[in-house]
Amino acid sequence: YGLFKLSELIGVSPLAYWCKVKPASQKEVVLTEDNMGVSREPSVKYRGFFINDEWPAFGNWCNRRFGGFTATMYEQVFELLLRLKGNYLWPAMWTSRFSVDGPGLDSAVLADEMGVIMGMSHHEPCLRHGEEYRYLRGKDSIYGDAWNFRTNEAGITRFWKDGLIRSGKFENVITVGMRGEADSAIMGEQATLADNINLLRDVLHTQNRLIKEHVNEDLDKVPRMLALYKEVEPFFYGDAETKGLKDSEELEGVTLMLCDDNFGNLRTLPTEEMRAHRGGYGMYYHFDYHG
């Protein structure tokens, strides 16, 4: 960050590559005591963005310039993120698989080398990409052929386990919880609030066990995140008849990512009582929304 600050002081924009903002040519650069400073620790630990709704513009550009969502492309994204003083990224996920398309783990290795902390989107738990299941599922697959924790618990659990074994060695914030395929509700309309809450409680219990077994026995040393997005928020709070996930031991130490309504309107804030939650809170805010 210090080097990028020097770069900023001599006139290099974070968007130098992306918007062709060419730095002005200077015969000499003079930095004085007025340019000196000590950066405080950021008040927000994980700061970043999510490459989403990436087709057609970003996807076509990646294919033309880099042959896909490769590590060569992500090097430019990582540098932009760091120049903006960020450190956390959710990669593109509509048709791509960050830990496969590098090729292989090249993008993940590069992120780790550059100090970028990787996450996956709110519906991609345990370091697995939504698109991966579409490619790997099948009647004879070890992962089964249904994105359904009730009917295919063994297959889904194996899918998550293998993701943690593959990518858990890097610096990540691990998404927990579960939503339906293609970013949809996890259960059908016939399911009750209690059905959904009980399912997620079982999912979280399994995911925490897998993380302890394959990443670190001390869960407090593994950053984890649950996004209270769309229908997940009422599962968190519950109602007068049904206890929600809010005080579940499975969420101890998990960062709770609060969400807007996709149009910039904040849906919820932690109460005074909730602020003591050990995992803290995050914010998932749509700068732009397509769909």
Task: Annotate each predicted stretch with a short phrase.
Residues W55, W94-S96, H122-C126, G180-A182, ...:
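Active-site-proximal loop/turn and secondary-structure-junction residues that shape catalytic pockets
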Residues F58-N60, P91, R128-H129, A185-I186, ...:
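Short helix/loop capping segments that flank catalytic or ligand/cofactor-binding pockets
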Residues E113-G138, I142-G144, N148-T151:
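Acidic/aromatic-lined carbohydrate-recognition and catalytic surfaces
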